[in-house]
Amino acid sequence: MKKHPKIRLLVMDVDGTLTDGCIYIGEEGEMMKAFHVQDGYGIVHILPELGISPAIITGRSSKIVEKRAGELKIHHLYQGVGDKLSKLRKLAEELGLNPENIAYIGDDANDLECIRWCGFSGCPADAVPEVLEAVHYVCRREGGRGAVREFISRLQCNP
């Protein structure tokens, strides 16, 4: 399987990227989020074939995200992160990676520093304008609707 020659880590935002950004609240106050199965397939089946590890860095904390990350075998999960770039730099250092070894996908202003720092970046089609202008690749799909899977496909063939 052909792959991007340098990328070894894919870092993903959650709300608005792996999900549609909506938070559903039931009558009893329970929160729910929707994740797309195509994104999950790409993370579990395609990334390992490419030799790329998945990671999540998100500003919110949620048991739902913890559960989904476990299902997808994402071992690098960081929730409630205020300074995403500092966390990303620390992770890169721990893994012995440079910015050019890291791909990042996110949708909002709090992702911009990471987007600018990484070697390859992308966003869902419905990202905020500043992000749409800053990334290397804008997905045709929206957040929570297969954008991450599309970005993973791009990692397969991007020189």
Predicted regions located by residue number:
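Mg2+-dependent phosphoryl-transfer enzymes with acidic/Ser/Thr/Gly-rich catalytic loops
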Residues: 29-33, 71, 76, 85-159
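Alpha-helical substrate-recognition element adjacent to the catalytic core
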Residues: 1-83
